[in-house]
């Protein structure tokens, strides 16, 4: 079976969804920009040699509809002979895109794929056009479709206090801002055109979603966002609304060597699981355990983790039950996470994987694990190994 390697991984800056940098930039343009940039950074691979493009996106309507993967590829002037497909596993969409491409390469059906994802939550809101089947209420609580309430449930079940959530959220912003100041994101962020507050066109090379002034004291003043009476989850301890895209060049190890391209990491194992929709945020725990089992590894073998921060109330139970609560500052989301950077749904799987690869190189560790919860009760995880 072919070994699957990541040759390169990039992303756009994360733009604020409400009146942010990309308010006049479409999702297809963010995607096409990364497709062009990834190919330009790796000229040894001709675009025509791509076997397929897998692109994650959740809200596949309006500008994100009608197979945005193909639309973006056409905008990027990728040769018409290269196919493209849009993948949807909600929050895990672009990580699923990576898994789909990896399996194609493992079986010999492909040698080189471009994968990634996008979500413009400012142009296509998360709830746009959603119409749940009324029959779901027979066996799934209505609140299971409300992500904030599932986070509240996890907080109650695992004893996650408001103070713990506020502290974790403040940490996310502090670490993301420190990473920005130290240029830790420089190798992954591709400068992307947008508009500043005055409407002037400029190139953005930083995440505008981060709030460096965030403190525990300021977060403590916010009201609960989802359960006004008994809740602890606030807007400040939830992932920010943002617009962005991320992309990865995935190849067979043999093809990468043929072309003289240096792989950055191997895909060691992959896993997807289901869980109760009412505690959808717990999905990373069984997904990570299954991915580690497939890789023949244990939690202690992993040098760094990227765990998507849907909510502080959601990620803290996962960290606790993976036995990592005492190692947060050594291993978990060292450059901040979605609370500070935002969670553009279809983008986030590729985004956290991209950040993870850079952290693995910076920390000089052999193994890294990226994992996410998924709305309606799923979890997804990928173990990467440095080459």
From Swiss-Prot:
Record keyword Transport present: no
The species this protein was found in: Shigella dysenteriae serotype 1 (strain Sd197)
Gene expressing this chain: fadA
Catalysed reactions, semicolon-separated: an acyl-CoA + acetyl-CoA = a 3-oxoacyl-CoA + CoA
Main location: cytoplasm
Coiled coil regions in record: none
GO BP annotations listed: fatty acid beta-oxidation; phenylacetate catabolic process
Sorted UniProt keywords: Acyltransferase, Cytoplasm, Fatty acid metabolism, Lipid degradation, Lipid metabolism, Transferase
UniProt superkingdom: Bacteria
Annotated protein name in UniProt: 3-ketoacyl-CoA thiolase
